Amino acid sequence: AIAANTKRVRVGPAIVNPYTTNPAEIAMAIVTLDELSAGRAVLGIGAGAPEFLSWIGLQSRHPLTRVKDTVQILRNLIADRRTAFEGNEFGRWTQQAYLRFKPIRGKIPIYIGAHGFKMLELIGEIGDGGLPSLFPPEFATRAIESISIGARRADRDVREIDISGCVWFSLSNDTDMAKEALRELIAYYGPHLAPVMIEEIGLNTADFDPIEDAIRRSDFETAKALVTERMMRLAIFGSPEQCIQRLEELEKTGVTQVNIGPPLGPRPEEAIETIGSKIIQYFLGNK
């Protein structure tokens, strides 16, 4: 629907994991979307969360290798290279493993989702772009450092890699309402965030134990109520002016664009309009 009703915006999934979806299926889906959007598709690949995968009986084995092999397979398929591939994660693919139609582009940008240091380095090594999880935004500096390490290892210039930082975002002139919209998200995902990320704002995993206990009891209202002011800093929230200030701080770290994630605000549609009319226009005017 987005592809059919737009002409300039890039479209694509962020982020698909190669445990629940085979690379061949991912390739067929993304080249179809690329054709529907007249060459505007982008693809995000990430290892997914081990605990969430375990809920459906899957084990997150060798995530780094699996993502790396997935990217290689996808590039072969999209470029219509009929070459055999053999790896530890997906076994042996013969030359018969190719798309039975020619994609309109031989290359679709592949962005790698990451929060751990090794996966962040992989962005620098092989990614056309990166989708680092910045929960909180203060993690950006360390994320960029890791991406740069990977880029140097592959003899690449990190400035050529599009780093699209993923942030939680809640926009409202009423700061209390903006924070209230964040409570459920932080309560649900906060206990699963990497310690190296949350320590940037003085949190540790034990801080989320009471929330996790409440969720296990299906006591979601208590879980939301236990979200603290410090935990709110995992996200960007507040008025347009407050959000712009934090986005400017993020820009200084080397992030090239921002992937604005949920909840957007207490009134999501209104927030989208304000992001377009005020926040995006502000940054366009300062270029």
Indicate residue ranges for each PLM-predicted region:
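Active-site-adjacent structural elements that line small-molecule/cofactor binding pockets in enzymes
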Residues: 1-287
